[in-house]
Amino acid sequence: MALKLNPLASQPYNFPSSARPPISTFRSPKFLCLASSSPALSSKEVESLKKPFTPPKEVHVQVLHSMPPQKIEIFKSMEDWAEQNLLTQLKDVEKSWQPQDFLPDPASDGFEDQVRELRERARELPDDYFVVLVGDMITEEALPTYQTMLNTLDGVRDETGASPTSWAIWTRAWTAEENRHGDLLNKYLYLSGRVDMRQIEKTIQYLIGSGMDPRTENNPYLGFIYTSFQERATFISHGNTARQAKEHGDLKLAQICGTIAADEKRHETAYTKIVEKLFEIDPDGTVMAFADMMRKKISMPAHLMYDGRDESLFDNFSSVAQRLGVYTAKDYADILEFLVGRWKIESLTGLSGEGNKAQEYLCGLTPRIRRLDERAQARAKKGPKVPFSWIHDREVQL
């Protein structure tokens, strides 16, 4: 699970909201609930009252365990199905690529020459490309959060840390495959000499410490819809960084990003198969879950990104990715359109009244998003230049 930017976050879209609890702001002075008669606090005093390691942005009050308990039996009944349809999507470790396959070999006599060649190729890449590539890598490196998120889901979590269930095996093995992505990009960026590794490492630590806010409610229906969307977003974003690396003449980096994109495509296939099976077993519950996630909008895993300086870091990163065409609002709409078609939403029958409403909402949402994006693009002005600590505070246009 990689970049998954939220191109909608910084644009004035007014999608329908779901009936959810209000937002709790953890880093804003609002959370203090001070009476109007209370004396104003200085910024240092407000900072001192914040809990350590709280996210840099507002986090929704969480809804917990929203799936009816009886539906846990659905996932227990899918154990054999998961073994035959999920675990077969995994690659044998001995046949899998490893980061070292794409990097200079430190044990070889030609190591220094190989590093020199890598750095020469990296010099041809512009700063804005590095901003997006670093953002990709940071998001990949927050993998502990994503495994944690999957293990919040009722009925499929790894209950022991080494559970033999098909669901638990999938989560651990998926994590193991994903772990190579951040490792590879991290080492490439380190060797490139183009970035401030300490600032990047701080950002990773902040992000893992902050967690993520996907609003999946311990509900595997919501969770697997979320991962289906995100894996496709990852496939698109890494595919675009591969294409642009090739355009800039770095064929080795293009191979790196393309290889990661291929992994994400395979993972997308697995997660979309789960939801497809849920539509077969429980079309009413699944279509309502899909509509619920889209009403809430898909929050991106790295949306709590922070480097210790810029609390708008994720929004700025998203703006650069949008401008470069790495991941855009159009991609968001394309993913939704793809999933609506993949899961045959229009042809669902026998739904309840609420299920029919969810179906109608989903079938009309992609055109609406496209119209809103077109209006936003028509109003869009050229963005300012802002410094990014990841590239030694060099400025990049948003």
Curated annotation (Swiss-Prot):
GO terms for molecular function: metal ion binding; stearoyl-[ACP] desaturase activity. Converts stearoyl-ACP to oleoyl-ACP by introduction of a cis double bond between carbons 9 and 10 of the acyl chain. It is found in: Plastid, Chloroplast; Plastid. Fe cation 2 binds at E178, E231, E264, H267. Homodimer. This is Stearoyl-[acyl-carrier-protein] 9-desaturase, chloroplastic. Fe cation 1 binds at E140, E178, H181, E264. SUPFAM superfamilies: Ferritin-like. InterPro entries: FADS-2_CS (IPR005803), Fatty_acid_desaturase-2 (IPR005067), Ferritin-like_SF (IPR009078), RNR-like (IPR012348). PANTHER family: ACYL- ACYL-CARRIER-PROTEIN DESATURASE-RELATED, STEAROYL-[ACYL-CARRIER-PROTEIN] 9-DESATURASE 7, CHLOROPLASTIC. PROSITE patterns: FATTY_ACID_DESATUR_2.
